[in-house]
Amino acid sequence: MPNLDRLPGCALAILTALAAFLVLAAAPARAADDAPEHEDWTARFQSTYIMQKKPGFTARYSGANSLLTTREQSYTLSATAHFGVRAWDGGELYFNPEMALGEPLSNLTGLGGYYNGEITRAGGSNPTFYRQRLFLRQTWNLGGEREHIDADLNRMAGFVDRNHVVLTVGNFSTLDIFDDNAYAKDPRTQFMNWGNMTYAAYDYAADARGFGWGFAAEWYRADGWVFRIGRMTGPREPNMLPTDPRIGKHYGDQIEIERAHEIGGQPGKVRVLGWRNRAVTASFRDALDYLRANPGGDPQTILKVRNGEKIKYGIGLNVEQAIDENLGVFLRAMKADGRTETYAFTEVDGSLSLGGALKGAAWGRAQDTFGVALLRNTLSPDRRAYLAAGGISFFIGDGALNYRPERIAEAYYSLELLKNTTLTLNAQHFANPAYNADRGPVNIFGMRLHTEF
């Protein structure tokens, strides 16, 4: 029998992915017409394999946290079970165990907008098993016309009043509740770049995998308005995995207002999100002062000046609009204050993304999707000055900085292979990687295999 421990990580991931896809694809799929109107329990599964390659590129210089100029390959594999039960009237309990493995490009350094929304789950070439989610969702109906909720991952089919309140408590992701978008949200099925799964400047509180403990309340109104508020735990140390449980002391707060509308008979939504974090982090001005006072020392001086609790905040706009039944467009824009180091997401202080997704009905492939997006990421003056002086941050630091906004173009084509199974080709182009005009441009090409049932 072969020794799997001796297989290279990528080879083991491919073998595991193929086995998972064969099992999942062979499982009987329920036809849409057979979908139940009401469920008292749910058991669903997903598996996603992503492989990406980066050709070599040129750079005038490199630093400790630069993207490597040599050719590289990255991969991730995740497999998740989504279990749920309707425990009482309006009460739903969900549990998601997950397995993940993978290896990033350049040890996950050298970019602002990263290339794979799954990469934070990858902890190396050996499979890691962990609890991804464990939460309670309680719904209170407030009267009015009834509407049907379709079954999905972590969602059971049923009926609710159009006017209702939802409380979610437990272990989940901020992005499970906030900043939804029909065309740019899920890196397992849509765009892969971090700046297309949420605002790149949204430094939302979470552990290194993107999850935490907390609560969120949502009020859905019959007139199309939705109001959301929530608080989540963050990491004990910025960007690390262990969670800080002191949710009354260190936390991330967010509030979001959503309005549904129609333009030309086509649906759309507008969302405004504000957030505020409180945690022990370093300010870039303190880090720059320390760097200048200690020439020749460790340039990652943010680690030396985490000397007190800081506040970080931002505000963003999220728009989605259907053009017709096959084409939709989106826009996200956010500005953060940028005075302190990254708490839990990535090195972006201002972000803009816009794009669209087109279903393949026009060429006889109704279940296929083609998407294209443009992104622009910027840094605050404080972070920019620190990096230009030779400072090293958590994800970026070239030793110098010829500052320009980081610009990204992303395109994908998702091809339905079997029911509930898709193969996606993805391409991303990065100009001024990590905001440095002296490096790049960089291209990353990817393939994704995804199935769920």
For the regions a language model picked out, list residue spans one by one:
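Hydrophobic, lipid-facing positions within transmembrane beta-strands of outer-membrane proteins
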Residues: W41, Y75-A81, Y130-L136, V165, ...
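Short loop/turn motifs that connect adjacent beta-strands in outer-membrane beta-barrel proteins
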Residues: A32-W41, P55-G56, G84-L93, N141-H164, ...
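Transmembrane beta-barrel strands of outer-membrane/channel proteins
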Residues: A43, S47-M51, F95-M99, L167-N171, ...
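Outer membrane beta-barrel transmembrane domains
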Residues: E258, L273-E309, F330, D337, ...
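Surface-exposed coil loops of outer-membrane beta-barrel proteins
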Residues: G110-N126, Y130, E145-G252, E256, ...
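Signature for the C-terminal beta-barrel architecture of outer-membrane proteins
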Residues: W194-V319, D324-V329, A333-T340, E347, ...
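Residue-level signature of outer-membrane beta-barrel architecture
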Residues: V85-A87, P97, Q138-W140, N171, ...
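Outer-membrane beta-barrel "beta-signal"
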Residues: Q132-E145, V372, P441-F453
